[in-house]
């Protein structure tokens, strides 16, 4: 008999949901069924799937099929699938994975586990959904996976169709393109591939994630989201299918709002489909639309909802990681040169601040102190940074430590800095110092008014880039981690001015709640992109608990 909450929730529970999880544990213990199959579309590196597959130590759900177009993100997805297969079916061989992570082996598998590596490649597929070949492969894989399960046993579809065209930033960019036509942008309609899978295979439940910009996006004067709701509620009608199929109720995870076939979407408060991640123990202000679709024969009254949690700050999440310095780009880099160049840059700013207006003048002694301390951090990190005493990685939250930390790792994965120009490093050091005093980032040219701080942008004083240099405030959840972090670090400046840098991939991954043993593959830019596009796994884990309870 299981009598420990950790047998259901393998990490210490979030403070506000202990009672809920205990009830859920009892419900799940009443069945001895096999793990519920999951099909994960547009999977990226696997954040949404990680949350589901880790529930109840991997016995509640099992990823049967995952699909990702990007070959580098697919490498990460496959590696994680391999880890799960080792964990669930051959735990005595987990050492193969850790030897690879710790830099003791070139490959994650040995001759004894190569079969699981190949199996992981069949589960995690690199295909383009929507293409003829991609759809044929996907359909064959889904059919094979679903045929293995006992008749009438449930299965779940998860995923988030690519969202660039929906995002507010993406739409602003498209407005600058005179030839852009929303109706011709295939990214608007990739959700119909998701819809096709719903219509063909009728999952008991689906979870669909997207940016909140989807709520206001329009094509030819019609709100896209209204059409999406109607399509998802009745996939057969949407796709003009001849056979009669199931309909779905589209449920909010944070309110009692439900959309059903025949309802008028204009009468809905669409914001009730937005999940604010920071309200649920995620150290990041990430606001996303997440739809829970429940097949009409599975629908029930009084559906469970996500439970609000205590806030987790940036410092909580990343403060326990090793301190690092940035790299000098476009010039020679060394510890001595970095200390000299950055120290001098901050000293110059300190002297200028001493004669500035009151808001900035206050910073002068703090900039002086930062300049004097700049040489105390002289490590730039590594893809595999050896663990040393003094950096425990702990967060101050037991449940988060049990979710993130892994004692089998001898290294910090993906924790390395990138290069920045010396003038940008001056801006980073200044902005982080400003934030340490005012608990906010400096805004625009009026608070970046010292010599050398203004970037060479013609419209710098227009107000368009008022938050171009944004510090992640240590005592607050971070701002949204996005794929833009792969381009530059200006929006993701570390709160410690002495480190004078942008966030590493591992720090961004922690703010997204990826476990420390989640090894992102590819070059650093590609790693950032994967992390920024993902669903926070710990949020997905809580959603998985809701789904498990509905299907229990």
Role assignments for model-derived ranges:
Residues 407-510, 515-522, 526-528:
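Polybasic, glycine- and aromatic-enriched phosphate-binding surface used to engage nucleic acids
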Residues 30-39, 43, 47-201, 212-226, ...:
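Core alpha/beta nucleotide-donor-binding catalytic domains of modification enzymes
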Residues 35-38, 64, 154, 270-272, ...:
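Extracellular structured ligand-interaction cores
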Residues 519-552:
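TerminUS-proximal long segments
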Residues 168-452:
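Class I S-adenosyl-L-methionine
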